[in-house]
Each structure stands twice: as structure tokens, then as C-alpha cells.
Amino acid sequence: MPYFPGVEKVRFEGPSSDAPLAFRHYDANKIILGKPMREHLRMAACYWHTFVWPGADMFGVGTFKRPWQRSGDPMELAIGKADAAFEFFSKLGIDYYSFHDTDVAPEGSSLKEYRHHFAQMVDHLERHQEQTGIKLLWGTANCFSNPRFAAGAASNPDPEVFAYAAAQVFSAMNATLRLKGANYVLWGGREGYETLLNTDLKREREQLGRFMRMVVEHKHKIGFKGDLLIEPKPQEPTKHQYDYDSATVFGFLHEYGLEHEIKVNIEANHATLAGHSFHHEIATAVSLGIFGSIDANRGDPQNGWDTDQFPNSVEEMTLATYEILKAGGFKNGGYNFDSKVRRQSLDDVDLFHGHVAAMDVLALALERAAAMVQNDRLQQFKDQRYAGWQQPLGQAVLAGEFSLASLAEHAFAHELNPQAVSGRQEMLEGVVNRFIYT
């Protein structure tokens, strides 16, 4: 049976369209910088916010009455949920999706049941992928919702919890391989602490390092060719998360020799919580060589928690996409909508409205960012600003030809007296605005 009988396939109709559900800017096959929009953006809809979340929050029960969330046999409901999901993906015209293991299959009362249920659902998802052509951007394991993970998964003080998490990640990685997923994500949902009074930081970091090494070893053993991605987040649900931001993740990866094995999946709202701009987190990851993929959403600047709203700022997404294009674009990653409708958006059609508007935002951002890359005024200014480092003194310093003492002697001997030069921030902000708004 159709789950969205009142919704036709969403189509591109252009900026002048008054249709309630139509793309004004996302023209999937429009060529931008030599390839179609869809290949640049690699957009995905997530399973958890779209098909699992019931509209509950800490102050109230779920407000949604989704047909796939009614009471009944867990496996029958899981199959119905998958059918609804692929109907949604197909009508939306999105190319990818993402999931946690327990989003798609009931956990059951034992690992044996978990494994059996998950295997059945992977078969079902595979059939849907073959029928629709929709692909898996990434899979992951939910090692944070069950009470056994209250003190973390890999960082848990109980090695049996560590082993249980390993069983889930093993299963989810194998499923991602089977479904030809492009990436596998490791979000440390509760890998952190509530209080230092009962926490051994060194031990927990070593446990995380050991777990990540095991994941990397398994990736190579099974022949998974996609990227492994850690998703940084500074806090929530714990007081302090170990994967605080991109720079922190890089430090952790470098400590355990994994900086060439694991990249980052950057979420806009998590950057906000870390006190950074989304632009900063992407630029940092690119500069460190660990940029992988994006969770596209936004936070509310008045709220200190993860609101996971749909992205709606062309300006913010233009700067993000500019950095990604400058870095060569997505390799295996993409823009995954880790976004949810508001609790009062009760109708099933609201799921379409949220995604369609966000997809249009990304399409506009891509066009603006492409224009910035083609006439790269920002890079031209940076090249000029740092030009001194291409001169003999700068090159000699970078090549290690000076010690601190010999460089000081050079400064004394040449009576150096450099003067400050304008950074032209306001001019550059005007340049960016002209690309975005004209």
C-alpha cells in the first residue's frame, strides 16, 4: 500500500513555480563545473529523524501518528517502515539514504535476535535498492540508546559492553559493505563523561583507540573501499564528548596512527555547539587532510542543544560548499540531511516540505560556490597576502635553513621593521555577498 498517496514525485519547476511541492533550484542533472548537481551534492535522507523519531521530547510524548509507527509485530513494522522510506526517497528524488542498525531492524532481546532481524532487513533493503537505484551513503551502529551504553560503548568501564558494541559495529559494517555503502560512520554518542569523579580519562582514551584500530583492521579484512568517518560533537548526551571537534579528532587519530585511515563527518549543528562556525569545521578538516562528509542541518543560536533543523541559510551553505569544491569535492561523502521536522509539523507531507526546501538551499549554495571558485577572488587575495612566504626569506624559513638564533641574527643584521598590512575583511565580506545575492 502507498504510504504517501497524496504526494506525486517532486520535480524541478524553476524559481517561478507556485506548486506547493516542487524544486525551484535543484535541477538534478544541471551541469555545474563539469558534472551534474546531483553528483556534486550527493544528498541523502536519514532514516532516524524521518522514520524513527515519534515527535517526542524530554517534556512530552510523541506527537506523530505515522502508519509505520503503530503497535504490532516489530518485524512487520520494520518492513513497512522500509517500504515507506523507499517510497519517500523515490518521490523526493533523492539519490542516497543513511541509517543506524536499530533504525531499520528491531533490536530484539538478545544478540542472536538482533543479528537475525538485521540480516532479514538487509535483504529487504537490498531489494529496495535494486528496484529503485537509491544508494546507501553510509551506515552506522546505534551504540548509545540502549541503557547498557549509559557509560559509553568503547569507553565503557565494562569490557562486556565494549564487546557488545563490537558485535553491533561488526554487523553494521558488514551490512554497509553488502549494501554497497559509500562510508561507515562512527558517532561517539556517549563516548565521554558526566563527571571526572568516576572517570579514568587515559584508560577510556586507550579503549577508544583500541576499538578504532579494530574497526580499521576489519575494514581492510572485509575489503570495504569506502571511508571510515568519526562524527565530532562537543557535548550532549554526555557533559563532555571525546570527539569534541575536528581538531580534537585529528589529535586523537594522530595519537593512534589512524590519521590516514579515518576522516570526519561534520555536522553543522555540532559545530555550533562546539563554539565554531560550520565553515571553520570544514576548513579545519580540509587543512588537516581528514575531511570526509557532511551532516546538513542547523542549530538555533538561542538554544544550547542539538535542534537538528533543516538547513535554510544559502550564505552559510555557500561558504561550506566553497570549501568542499576547493578541496576537490566529495570523494565518498555527501550532504546527509540529519534534520527533522518540528514537533508541531504533524502531517506526513511536512517531511517532504522540509527536505525539498533544504535541497533547494543546497542547490543555490552550489551555484553560488561554483561562481566563487571560477572567479576566486578570495584565493587571489590570500595568494597576495601570503606572497612573502614565496620569497627567499620565507622559503628558507620553511625549509629549515634557519635556527631561532640565526633567524634572529638575520633580523638584527637587516634591521627588519615590517609594517602591518590591511586584512581587508570588510571588502572580502562584500565580495562574498555579491556572489551570493546577485
Swiss-Prot record:
EC number: 5.3.1.5
Binding site for Mg(2+): 306, 308
Subcellular location: Cytoplasm
Catalytic reaction list: alpha-D-xylose = alpha-D-xylulofuranose
Top EC group: isomerase
Disulfide partners: none
Keywords noted in UniProt: Carbohydrate metabolism, Cytoplasm, Isomerase, Magnesium, Metal-binding, Xylose metabolism
Gene Ontology BP terms: D-xylose metabolic process
Cofactor: Mg(2+)
Entry note: cofactor: Binds 2 magnesium ions per subunit.
Highest taxon of the lineage: Bacteria
UniProt KW Cell membrane keyword: no
GO cellular component terms given for this protein: cytoplasm
Predominant location category: cytoplasm
GO molecular function: magnesium ion binding; xylose isomerase activity
PROSITE patterns (UniProt xref): XYLOSE_ISOMERASE
Subunit structure: Homotetramer.
PANTHER family with a match to the protein in the record: PTHR48408, XYLOSE ISOMERASE
Family the entry assigns: Belongs to the xylose isomerase family.
UniProt cross-references to HAMAP family, sorted A to Z: Xylose_isom_A
Protein's name in the database: Xylose isomerase
Species name: Pseudomonas fluorescens (strain SBW25)
